[in-house]
Design a protein with these regions (language model features):
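N-terminal amphipathic, basic-rich helices that act as targeting or association modules
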Residues: 1-84
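A short alpha-helix capping/helix-coil boundary motif
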Residues: 8-9, 21-23, 46-48, 123, ...
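A short, structure-level motif marking secondary-structure boundaries and short turns
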Residues: 15, 28, 158-160, 194-196
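Aromatic side chains
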Residues: 39, 47, 83-86, 161, ...
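Cofactor-binding active-site loop characterized by glycine-rich and histidine/acidic residues
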Residues: 44, 51-181, 199-205
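A short, conserved beta-to-alpha structural element at the edge of catalytic cores
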Residues: 181-201
């Protein structure tokens, strides 16, 4: 992992944000992080017992990103998730009962048990789900952003992708198009340092 130092401006802004949020909001955010961690550990246990169909990409250790990102958005904004997205779904307001039902292949799940761990979409809550193709959600975010712009609504699309997806050409093409068209898209690269199994220093120079 590369060592780096935060600029004085970033440190100053960090302290400002902490002050703005206040102790009650910070406690609420911490509680949410604990809930996500507990949920993920339970999901991992069920997966190891063979109760979950399909594969599972956990987000243990990435809870703060999920909670922080969701608190930066507002009701009515859109979410496009990625492979390790359980925490983002929960932070966006998804029901843990319906999420777990989805993992277990039950009809009461968000996608009637057919989407499994990764494809949880809660369209009523503007959570548009994840894509089976690495970085597949990033170009879709351009379409969502264009829709927002054409409808002239005060919304934003948050699209999340990992460091592994950052190697995909579609990510850079999509960012360029969103920039040219001035679209309301927020790109969040959730860098866990290893993607699936490739250390970041070997994937990027």
């Amino acid at each position: 992992m590369t060592d780096f130092e935060l600029s004085p401006e970033v440190v100053r802004r960090y302290h400002e944000v902490i002050e703005e949020l206040g102790p009650e909001k910070l406690k609420e955010m911490l509680q949410r992080m604990y809930e996500i961690r507990s949920f993920e550990l339970r999901a991992e246990k069920l997966y190891s017992l063979g109760k979950v169909h399909g594969t599972m990409h956990l987000s243990v250790g990435q809870e703060a990103t999920s909670v922080g990102a969701s608190y930066g958005m507002k009701k009515g904004d859109y979410l496009l998730n990625h492979h390790r997205g359980h925490g983002h779904c929960m932070a966006w307001g998804a029901s843990i009962d319906r999420m777990m039902a989805e993992f277990l292949g039950r009809e009461t799940g968000y996608c009637r048990g057919r989407g499994g761990s990764m494809h949880i979409a809660d369209v009523d809550n503007n959570n548009l789900g994840a894509n089976g193709i690495v970085a597949g959600g990033v170009p879709i975010a351009v379409g969502v952003g264009l829709s927002i712009k054409m409808r002239k609504t005060d919304q934003v699309c948050l699209v999340i992708f990992g460091d592994g997806a950052a190697n995909e050409g579609a990510v850079h093409e999509s960012m360029n198009m969103a920039s040219i068209w001035d679209l309301p898209v927020v790109y969040l690269c959730e860098n866990n340092q290893y993607a699936m199994s490739m250390p970041m220093p070997k994937a990027f120079n």
